[in-house]
């Protein structure tokens, strides 16, 4: 399946390890961009009824998902894991199997570690994977670029958040599109 064949009824969001204790290794501007896009994704995916599952890496040491994201997350499944590859965690796999969707959209941290390992495993399991380039991050630009390049070379589709959302909505004459425009304006105002 080409990424252009995706639709709200065949995708699932996986949010990987967006935890505040990881933020000090990232540039503040990168954290703000990624957080803004993750919040946009969560709000829109809830609006158009796309299921979401998430992970938190080693909560005992790294704490929980960033508070604003966690508040918006609601009661979607969230797995505490210690394995870098999310697919190596049995509870994560159980959550993934609850939603039999062929396309997995990926956001979170860090691009070259947990995100990369998870994407490679999902591809081996015959999922189509869409990595949102502006909703993943690493401690350095080089590591981020390496992670993105590695995922693309192995078959993941690399998009940005806005491209994906507009593609899913298809048209401008819906309440969902009006909601997206409102969210994009709020996002732009918060960044300026």
Name these PLM-found stretches:
Residues 2-12, 48, 60-192:
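Active-site-adjacent betaalpha module
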Residues 9-11, 27-45, 49-53:
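A short alpha/beta connector and helix-capping loop motif
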Residues 11-19:
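N-terminal nucleotide-binding beta1-loop-alpha1 segment
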Residues 15, 52-57:
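Short beta-strand segments at enzyme active-site cores
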Residues 18, 57, 134:
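Active-site loop/turn elements of alpha/beta-hydrolase fold enzymes
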Residues 20-25:
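Short acidic, Gly/Ser-rich segments with clustered Asp/Glu that frequently serve as metal-coordination loops
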Residues 27-29, 53-54, 105-106, 134-135:
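Short, contiguous strand/loop micro-motifs
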Residues 30-31, 56, 81-84:
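Short, flexible loop segments at the rims of nucleotide/cofactor-binding pockets, characterized by
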């Amino acid at each position: 399946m080409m990424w252009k064949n995706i639709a709200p009824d065949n995708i699932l969001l996986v949010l990987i390890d967006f935890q505040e204790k990881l933020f000090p290794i990232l540039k503040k501007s990168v954290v703000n961009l990624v957080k803004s896009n993750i919040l946009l994704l969560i709000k829109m995916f809830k609006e158009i009824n796309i299921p979401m599952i998430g992970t938190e890496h080693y909560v005992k040491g790294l704490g929980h998902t960033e508070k604003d994201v966690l508040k918006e997350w609601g009661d979607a499944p969230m797995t505490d894991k210690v394995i870098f590859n999310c697919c190596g965690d049995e509870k994560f796999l159980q959550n993934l199997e609850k939603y039999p969707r062929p396309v997995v959209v990926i956001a979170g941290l860090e691009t070259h570690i947990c995100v990369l390992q998870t994407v490679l495993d999902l591809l081996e399991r015959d999922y189509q994977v869409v990595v949102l380039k502006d909703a993943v991050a690493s401690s350095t630009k080089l590591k981020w670029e390496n992670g993105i390049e590695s995922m693309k070379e192995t078959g993941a589709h690399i998009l940005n958040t806005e491209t994906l959302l507009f593609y899913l909505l298809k048209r401008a004459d819906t309440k969902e599109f009006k909601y997206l425009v409102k969210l994009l304006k709020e996002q732009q105002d918060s960044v300026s």
